[in-house]
């Protein structure tokens, strides 16, 4: 197939859970593109698995070397946090299929870099009330909860994933994550049909 499945959706829509389930799903054989970030590691996250954690200096070195495919920067209440995708030796589309999590903006840049025929968008959505509750539950479980940042992210997602931006990115198929098992089944079928 040689495709990149790009999971997108607002924070706490279930992307991380679906991502992990897709990687474990036996018939798809997806590998992961691990993104990079300058934000602090969260409780339970693993460097090189969830993200490649770096600092601003590391980001600038990758930028100068021309390896950054796409990047987003967020002025958080804790400072500037960057998230970015790097063209490194781990991406071998001629040999493998991949799965990654990104924003609409990231999807557009990935599509431009690799070609539209190589990138399969999977947009996950959920009721905002449920999403806010999930975000709160996740933040409560952190050693040092960052509630102010959680609220900022929730509100920013309403703009970053506006209906106009979803349509402008060319997203035609959406997956409602009301129940994980049925949502996951629909996504697996969608990937299999679009190989």
Regions picked out by a protein language model, each given a short descriptive name:
Residues 24-33:
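Post-Walker A helix-loop "phosphate-sensing" segment adjacent to the P-loop in P-loop NTPases
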Residues 140-191:
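Small-molecule kinase domains that catalyze NTP-dependent phosphoryl transfer to phosphate-bearing small molecules
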Residues 16:
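Walker A/P-loop
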Residues 7:
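Hydrophobic anchor at the beta1->P-loop junction of P-loop NTPases
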Residues 10:
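P-loop (Walker A) phosphate-binding loop of NTP-binding proteins
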Residues 37-98, 102-104:
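ATP-dependent small-molecule kinase phosphotransfer cores
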Residues 97-103, 114-137:
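Conserved phosphate-donor/acceptor-positioning beta-strand/loop module used by diverse small-molecule
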């Amino acid at each position: 197939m040689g495709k990149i499945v790009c999971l997108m959706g607002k924070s706490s829509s279930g992307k991380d859970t679906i991502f992990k389930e897709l990687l474990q799903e036996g018939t798809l054989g997806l590998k992961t593109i691990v993104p990079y970030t300058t934000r602090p590691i969260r409780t339970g996250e693993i460097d090189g698995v969830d993200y490649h954690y770096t600092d601003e200096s590391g980001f600038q070195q990758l930028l100068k070397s021309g390896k950054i495919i796409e990047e987003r920067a967020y002025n958080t209440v804790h400072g500037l946090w960057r998230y970015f995708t790097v063209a490194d030796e781990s991406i071998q589309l001629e040999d493998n299929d991949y799965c990654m999590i990104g924003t609409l903006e990231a999807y557009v840049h990935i599509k431009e870099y690799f070609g539209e025929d190589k990138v399969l968008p999977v947009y996950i959505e959920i009721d905002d009330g449920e999403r806010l509750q999930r975000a709160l539950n996740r933040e409560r479980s952190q050693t040092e909860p960052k509630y102010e940042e959680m609220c900022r992210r929730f509100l920013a997602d309403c703009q970053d994933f506006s209906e106009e931006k979803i349509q402008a990115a060319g997203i035609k198929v959406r997956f409602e994550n009301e129940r994980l098992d049925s949502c996951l089944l629909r996504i697996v079928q969608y990937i299999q049909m679009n190989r």
